[in-house]
Each structure stands twice: as C-alpha cells, then as structure tokens.
Amino acid sequence: MRIAVKLAFHEDAALRLLNWLAQENALLLRAQPDLPLLYDSGVFYRRELDETWCDYLNMLAQGHEDCDGLAAARAGELIARGWTALRPGDDGFAEAQRARPARIRAEVMLTTRSEPDNPGLYHCIVRYPL
C-alpha cells in the first residue's frame, strides 16, 4: 500500500513523523525477531529526489534508503532490540555490553547548517543515551 502525505516543511513536524516511523519500525522488529539488523541487511544509502519514508519491511524490499529512512530504521532497532543491536565501534557499545538494556531510548535528530526559519539541506542522525 502507498500512502502519500504532503506537508509544508517544519522541523518539529518532520521529527515527530520520523520518530513515529522509528516506533513503527520497533513494533515490526519486535513482532518479527528473525528480521536482520540494518547493518546485516545489505541495505545501502541512496539519495532520493523525492522524500519517500519506508517502514523497515519496505526498506528491506527496496534495498536502499536515504538518511531519514536509515535513521528511522536504526532508531527502531535500538528501541526494539536494545544492546544486541549495537556493534563494536558503535558509541556506547562497551557500556551496553555491561548493562545489557533490553531497549535503548533512541530518537531521530536533524542536523543542518541552515539558518533558523530558512529550510535548507538537512541530515538525519540517531541519538541514544546509555
């Protein structure tokens, strides 16, 4: 099924939608524990001309995503799978190995060099405390 939503850009609204997608991805990953983690999936980065945000299943089928979809996927797997989603070299890996949290409170964040109230190029990242 395809659902298109057209919005006037607002940073807070974009973050709410991306974090909603991360939560949906977490639900999918909990319901289907055999799904591969993002770094094991073969999915790669590809810049999009039009923004299409896929859930985890559609991202796997498509085989690629840009930073927004990849960030929502990564946040979703940290939320769903906790410490087992971290790999050596990831921030907080050693601490997560010791604490073994079942869930990590991950969220999608936006970074930009644009001035306030002047949308420009944004990049999505994942932030998570341990």
Predicted features and spans:
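A structural boundary/capping signal
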Residues: 1-130
